Amino acid sequence: MVEYKPIKKVVSGNYAAAYAVLHARVQVVAAYPITPQTSIIEKIAEFIANGEADIQYIPVESEHSAMAACIGASATGARVFTATSAQGLALMHEMLHWAAGARLPIVMVDVNRAMAPPWSVWDDQTDSLSQRDTGWMQFYAENNQEVYDGVLMAFKVAETVNVPAMVVESAFILSHTYEIVNMIPQELVDEFLPPRKPLYSLADFENPIAVGALATPADYYEFRYKLARAHEEAKKVIKDVGREFGERFGRDYSEMIEKAYIDDADFVFMGMGSLMGTVKEAVELLRKQGYKVGYAKVRWFRPFPREELLEIAESVKGIAVLDRNFSFGQEGILFTEAKGALYNNGARPIMKNYIVGLGGRDFTVSDVKAIAEDMKKVIESGKLDREVEWYHLKR
């Protein structure tokens, strides 16, 4: 690890994101305010007003326009950032496809917020996961430190494989809650994240090109294949960047799934984001009570870490998949992805889906303990009473 003195700041998740944008030397920000994302953009605007950041800020009239502006700026070779939540992310949908298809390494923070109606400003992963097929990579932060680190790593990964990346944090649980974050001195960030070397630039007037023009059936197929390959290639890049980050700064992200106690666990809890902090605390207590249980925190949902999941599945009898989201007419989204990843690979642990915390409903250590007791019964009996459990349902 590089010897350095971290800059300790007590900041919210949103401010952690803004500081990462500052330290990444982002050149262009285009955004439209929406609760609970707003303070990210306000803090960036403060940096600009105080002369701390040399960022071109583009005020726009909607989230669709924000992403359109980001696309234009990124296509000229700039390092570009935006942020949004929920309905704003949904309004961006068309442009998300465009950014990925044009191979533009834009980084966006999505502050997870439940989709309306009914209106809700609280935590729910459905907004980001409903964009899983747009071609964006997705990193889920457990805490404010991971928000800061995640933005820095997302830029390096995205600019290496030329695919946009989304860093996802929980509404209010992280976005407006203050924690100590160890920030990195600017000169060390510069060494880790050098200036962007664009795949192409519309500002290169000596070598004019067209981007996004019509592709006939003779060519379109290969464009999709190349984007698909970029996602697969991103897995190695993610691990390499995560390992380098750990070697430089002491926080290792070389695994796409952070895991513990897999070797002796009968079953593991699998989930993403801030709820996994609760799970970790509960697992420590449960193990002291004699439960053979572990956890698997999915850091990167896209590209999906199927190889790492298979290693876990081969070691345990069961997986309790915790989804703070739901795909209507189906089941929890992480549950679907996990089952699909294992289907042709031999490992078939018993899997049960628990729908938890929708719309920001509290998910506590006591809830994890209750789910552990249910999973213990499932493992002992060898069969499911039901595949999907709406755990928090009022009865």
UniProtKB/Swiss-Prot annotation:
Top-level taxonomic group: Archaea
Xref: InterPro entries: PFOR_II, Pyruvate:ferred/Flavod_OxRd, Pyrv_Fd/Flavodoxin_OxRdtase_N, THDP-binding, Transketo_C/PFOR_II
SUPFAM superfamilies named among the record's database cross-references: Thiamin diphosphate-binding fold (THDP-binding), TK C-terminal domain-like
Record's protein name: Ketoisovalerate oxidoreductase subunit VorA
Record-linked Pfam families: PFOR_II, POR_N
Assembly and interaction partners: Heterotetramer of one alpha, one beta, one delta and one gamma chain.
GO MF term (any one): 3-methyl-2-oxobutanoate dehydrogenase (ferredoxin) activity
Catalytic activity: 3-methyl-2-oxobutanoate + 2 oxidized [2Fe-2S]-[ferredoxin] + CoA = 2-methylpropanoyl-CoA + 2 reduced [2Fe-2S]-[ferredoxin] + CO2 + H(+)
Swiss-Prot/TrEMBL keywords: Oxidoreductase
EC number: 1.2.7.7
GO biological process: organic acid metabolic process; response to oxidative stress; sulfur compound biosynthetic process
